[in-house]
Regions:
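Phosphate-group recognition and catalysis centered on beta-loop-alpha active-site segments
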Residues: 1-218
Length: 218
């Protein structure tokens, strides 16, 4: 059966990337997708944007971040144990704005979190390549522009375990030639597109509304 990924959980119902949002989504999907960053005090935080109120997440301590969010408990955003999430996870590792030492710390802190059925991905292809031998789970790269298809194709040939998280419009490119059984398409919120991508044989589809889209899976 093709897989449904809940994009940041159920973001239209709950705070995106919150533990509550992720666990609620798992009622409807096979995986939840969530973003992971690192704080100034080296905690893993489930947070999409690189900044908060014009300061980088990497420059803020956990307490400073929580003080700027309304009524958010620490355990909703700080990932300290894999047991917080009750199903399979696609962890997207966010490294934009980080220097290499921080990137290494972020990936190293993720290693004991990962479960064998998880997928760890990033726009930082180099770090995925550098750490892939240490991952206890599947891994992949994210691409959102056509020029990236050429290098991704080469990687797909040389690494038969690599997954590809592909922005949906790239499937219309004449240069798209990635293995569909290792391709996950984002972000799909229209019924016809959802059904089409699953029918064409993609491994999975990422959606903001898994509570709706699961109805259309055959």
């Amino acid at each position: 059966m093709k897989k449904i990924f809940g994009h940041r959980g159920l973001p239209l119902t709950y705070m995106e990337n919150s533990i509550t949002s992720l666990n609620a989504a798992l009622e409807y999907c096979d995986y939840v997708e969530t973003d992971v960053r690192i704080t100034a005090d080296n905690n893993l935080i489930l947070f999409h944007d690189p900044d908060l109120n014009e300061r980088f997440i990497k420059e803020l301590t956990t307490e400073e971040i929580l003080s700027q969010l309304d009524n958010v408990e620490k355990d909703e955003l700080i990932l300290s144990s894999r047991d917080q999430i009750k199903g399979k996870v696609n962890f997207e590792i966010k490294t934009d704005s980080l220097l290499q030492p921080q990137i290494d710390i972020l990936f190293q802190k993720m290693l004991p979190i990962l479960h064998p059925e998880d997928i760890v991905t990033s726009f930082n292809w180099k770090s995925i390549q550098d750490f892939k031998e240490l991952f206890s789970c599947r891994y992949g790269i994210i691409l959102d522009h056509e020029d990236a298809l050429f290098e991704a194709k080469s990687l797909s040939i040389h690494d038969e375990d690599m997954f590809f998280m592909v922005e949906r419009t790239l499937l219309d490119s004449r240069h798209f030639d990635l293995p569909l059984n290792r391709t996950v398409i984002w972000t799909v919120n229209e019924k016809n597109d959802f059904v089409h991508f699953l029918d064409m044989g993609a491994f999975g589809v990422i959606t903001d509304i898994p509570d709706t889209m699961h109805i259309y899976r055959k």
